[in-house]
């Protein structure tokens, strides 16, 4: 068996300083996730009625509710947990470091889940699924939901080949359509590329988080090997 004793620095400082530095980076990234999640929740709240009326697929429901809420919650936990991580690392609190590492593992799993969901939605071409639901609702009795979305997105009809329902497409006082862009192009520009960015960001943040966990584990091992009183962690 390989002896790993000499692989861990003898001085905890060389472990806790990088741990604090990486936690600071994660704190900033946590704020970014909070902002992205808040924007996503606000944006997709306008799709709530559309999702209900269209009897949307699971992928569409995940896009409008699960993904943005997941990003927001993970961001909030990052902001809180990284502050705690900096404190317990600086004070070399053994119990705190163990709890911190366990919580980071849970968040890492959640982050992988959200990132994987975002990439899956991107690869499954969720915009096409939105288009199918859009056409169904446009030709149904509750097409006023589509008119609200058109006003919000500032677009007219789903695409150039979709049916031209006279009740849809916002018009001015002269009956002229207010917007020239089709809704598929607007939604595609706002969703498709951003889903890929969320997935890529989740992978990047996950790597940094994994490094933090390694430093925390090494620091735990070093603290356990150092002579100390049992009451040290509770001071």
Swiss-Prot record:
Glycosylated residues: list them. Answer: 62, 143, 159
What keywords tag this UniProt record?
Answer: Glycoprotein, Membrane, Transmembrane, Transmembrane helix
Report one GO cellular component: membrane
The record's gene field reads tspB
| Family statement | Belongs to the tetraspanin (TM4SF) family.
Instruction: State if Transmembrane is listed as a keyword.
Output: yes
Q: Which residue ranges are assigned to the Cytoplasmic compartment in the record's topology?
A: 1-23, 90-93, 222-235
The chain's Extracellular topological domains, given as residue ranges, are: 45-68, 115-200
Q: Know the name of this protein?
A: Probable tetraspanin tspB
Q: How does it sit in the membrane?
A: Multi-pass membrane protein
Location comes to: Membrane
Report TM segments. 24-44, 69-89, 94-114, 201-221
């Amino acid at each position: 068996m390989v002896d790993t004793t000499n692989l861990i620095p003898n001085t905890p400082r060389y472990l806790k300083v990088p741990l604090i530095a990486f936690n600071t980076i994660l704190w900033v990234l946590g704020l970014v996730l909070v902002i992205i999640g808040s924007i996503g929740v606000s944006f997709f709240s306008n799709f709530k009625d559309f999702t209900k009326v269209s009897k949307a697929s699971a992928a569409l429901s995940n896009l409008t509710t699960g993904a943005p809420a997941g990003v927001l919650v993970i961001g909030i936990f990052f902001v809180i947990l990284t502050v705690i991580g900096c404190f317990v690392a600086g004070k070399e609190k053994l119990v705190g470091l163990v709890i911190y590492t366990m919580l980071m593992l849970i968040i890492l799993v959640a982050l992988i889940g959200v990132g994987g969901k975002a990439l899956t939605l991107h690869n499954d071409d969720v915009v096409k699924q939105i288009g199918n639901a859009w056409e169904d609702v446009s030709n149904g009795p509750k097409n006023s939901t589509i008119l609200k979305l058109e006003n919000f997105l500032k677009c007219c009809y789903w695409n150039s080949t979709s049916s031209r329902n006279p009740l849809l497409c916002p018009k001015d006082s002269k009956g002229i359509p207010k917007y020239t862009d089709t809704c598929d192009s607007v939604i595609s520009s706002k969703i498709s590329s951003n889903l890929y960015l969320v997935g890529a960001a989740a992978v990047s943040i996950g790597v940094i988080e994994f490094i933090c966990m390694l430093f925390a584990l090494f620091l735990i091992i070093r603290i356990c090997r150092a002579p100390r009183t049992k009451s040290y962690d509770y001071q």
